[in-house]
């Protein structure tokens, strides 16, 4: 079925910044998608087209909206491409753009159309979105993911002094996604009580992704808070810990500055890649850490390869790989990590996201589907993680509606699957 109409508009994300929303209309109805945006962005990501000053602090997206309405819409409609041919829809837009990083039309323009068209394709096929995505990826079975709840926020996501960006809990010992949500919620509320009693009510303010942002600087203190909350909730042994260090954010002149939020940070206290690796090893030996994301700068390749070779846990590439098949292949060749963080807006289309996922899975890697810190109520990635059967998702704390939109959709999907639902659990790396 051909596309009848495409219309884009400027809306707002969870940080109050403009973003792109796209409506695709077919004979089956209107299908809407909104594009997320990151705070800690990799330099190798596809280009998110912004208007620049003066309006909206330079973050307006009217250029991207205009590119959808005046360039993508008329040309894609005229092409007559069937909305169920996702690869053709995406290739048409990539060819129309003609640049390696989508800088002409904007990745945010292309992705909005790609996501909306995927929803339209599912309706055309009469399938739930997660099952349609599974068919696009060639998967006969689907799996419910382990949620990685970001419950303590630091780095560029919070106004505290914590260098590392995300301290997460993973209910790997749950028997279903529904139970994982119960565990996540209970640990979260126990964590709030622990933080309140130790640092006061002010410390219970939350960051961009719904996690708490207590005014602490010691990363080990953050991990200790998690361990205490897990124990108080009664889930020791059922909940593992994951981290996103976002180390590119505190990489300076070849070293790592764990006090990077302090404008008077002393260069003499910055540490080498090897010393940084020792910090991680100490954490791993003390806490039930099963996954570390972006432990080093996005171009500090030797450090990545060395750590991945030395430890057994999951090492996740985000800024390193930016969901880009070329970067993923380089990381595979150099054995730089063993898990891909999949963010649809880093690469800018559904088809390329599926390609990057399949490439990682075929290399024996894990894949974790991820939100961005600037999110909307769109819940596409919930269906994506089930359809691609990656077994793990991170989309914030069990707090803030733009985060719960994804988790609630996963609850609906598990209900829809009924007795056929399988939870990845402790096999989240290779479900």
From Swiss-Prot:
GO terms for molecular function: magnesium ion binding; phosphopyruvate hydratase activity. It comes from the Eukaryota. The keyword Lyase applies. InterPro entries: Enolase, Enolase-like_C_sf, Enolase-like_N, Enolase_C, Enolase_CS, Enolase_N. Its EC number is 4.2.1.11. The active site is at 209 (proton donor), 343 (proton acceptor). It catalyses: (2R)-2-phosphoglycerate = phosphoenolpyruvate + H2O. GO terms for biological process: glycolytic process. Keywords: Cytoplasm, Glycolysis, Lyase, Magnesium, Metal-binding. It holds the Pfam family Enolase_N. Substrate binds at residues 157, 166, 293, 318, 370-373, 394. Mg(2+) binds at residues 244, 293, 318. One of its GO terms (cellular component) is phosphopyruvate hydratase complex. Pathway: Carbohydrate degradation; glycolysis; pyruvate from D-glyceraldehyde 3-phosphate: step 4/5. Its cofactor is Mg(2+). It is an enzyme of class 4 (lyase). Mg(2+) is required for catalysis and for stabilizing the dimer. It is found in: Cytoplasm. Its main location: cytoplasm. Belongs to the enolase family. Homodimer. This is Enolase. It comes from Fasciola hepatica (Liver fluke). The gene is ENO.
């Amino acid at each position: 079925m051909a596309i009848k109409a495409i219309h884009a508009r400027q809306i707002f994300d969870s940080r109050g910044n403009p973003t792109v929303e796209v409506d695709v209309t077919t004979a089956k109805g209107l299908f809407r998608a909104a594009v997320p945006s990151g705070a800690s962005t990799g330099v190798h990501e596809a280009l998110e087209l912004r208007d620049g000053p003066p309006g909206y602090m330079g973050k307006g997206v009217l250029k991207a909206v205009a590119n959808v309405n005046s360039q993508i819409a008329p040309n894609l409609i005229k092409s007559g491409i069937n909305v169920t041919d996702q690869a053709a829809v995406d290739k048409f837009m990539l060819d129309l753009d003609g640049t390696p990083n989508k800088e002409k039309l904007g990745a945010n323009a292309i992705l909005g159309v790609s996501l909306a068209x995927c929803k339209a394709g599912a309706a055309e096929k009469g399938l739930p979105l997660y099952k349609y995505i599974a068919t696009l990826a060639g998967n006969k079975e689907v799996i419910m993911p382990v949620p990685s709840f970001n419950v303590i926020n630091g780095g560029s996501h919070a106004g505290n002094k914590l260098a590392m960006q995300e301290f997460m809990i993973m209910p790997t010992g749950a028997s279903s996604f529904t139970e994982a949500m119960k565990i996540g919620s209970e640990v979260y509320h126990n964590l709030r009580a622990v933080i309140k009693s130790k640092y006061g009510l002010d410390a219970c303010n939350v960051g961009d992704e719904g996690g708490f942002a207590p005014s602490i600087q010691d990363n080990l203190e953050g991990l200790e808070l998690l361990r205490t909350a897990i124990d108080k909730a009664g889930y020791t042994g059922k909940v593992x810990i994951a981290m996103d260090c976002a180390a590119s954010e505190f990489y300076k002149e070849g070293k790592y500055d764990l006090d990077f939020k302090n404008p008077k940070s002393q260069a003499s206290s910055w540490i080498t890649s090897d010393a940084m690796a020792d910090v991680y090893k100490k954490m791993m030996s003390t806490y039930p850490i099963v996954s570390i994301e972006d432990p080093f700068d996005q171009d500090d390749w030797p450090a990545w390869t060395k750590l991945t070779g030395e430890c057994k846990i999951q090492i996740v590439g985000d800024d390193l790989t930016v969901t880009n098949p070329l970067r993923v292949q380089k990381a595979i060749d150099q054995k730089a990590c063993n898990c891909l963080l999949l963010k649809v807006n880093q690469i800018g289309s559904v088809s390329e996201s599926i390609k990057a996922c399949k490439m990682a899975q075929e290399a024996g890697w894990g894949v974790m589907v991820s939100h961005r810190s600037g999110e909307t109520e769109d819940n596409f990635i919930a269906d994506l993680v089930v359809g691609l059967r990656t077994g793990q998702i991170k989309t914030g704390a069990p707090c803030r509606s733009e985060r719960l939109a994804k988790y609630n959709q996963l609850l609906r999907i598990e209900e829809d699957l009924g007795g056929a639902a399988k939870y990845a659990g402790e096999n989240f790396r290779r479900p």
